């Protein structure tokens, strides 16, 4: 059971609000007010390069059935869980319903919610927020590439700035986020 200060989502003495990250958020938090460095002992979550972003990158998202991989986390400098959630939505350019917040109701795309709730409760965090965007590939929202070859094939079609951004995203993804598709994508860009 949560005590009063946690149930209200307000930071009390010694209570931490944290963000989970696995992609560009880790190396480019933008407006997100992080406290200290990213920690490498985040929850293990089902992630894959499965969402084509507006700029053409194939980004890491929570993906049903994907191989679970370790994530990262950092403490945030906000006074309520809702403020941390709103800040992450702003950084991601996403609607609030696409940003998870625990404790609370699962986001629309709830993949990983149970694991995050268990991890957050076990650490005694006051609130945990994360990006809860769905896979999107080949114009289909909610579906990712069928396999690594399809993902690599898509990346092989990119040119110019889109190719540069996509290559940077794969290259700079945290080392511990070794998804099932990652080796094939690195080979596409000859990343070593």
Where does each model-flagged region fall?
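A glycine-rich, hydrophobic/aromatic-adjacent loop/helix-cap motif
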Residues: 2-192
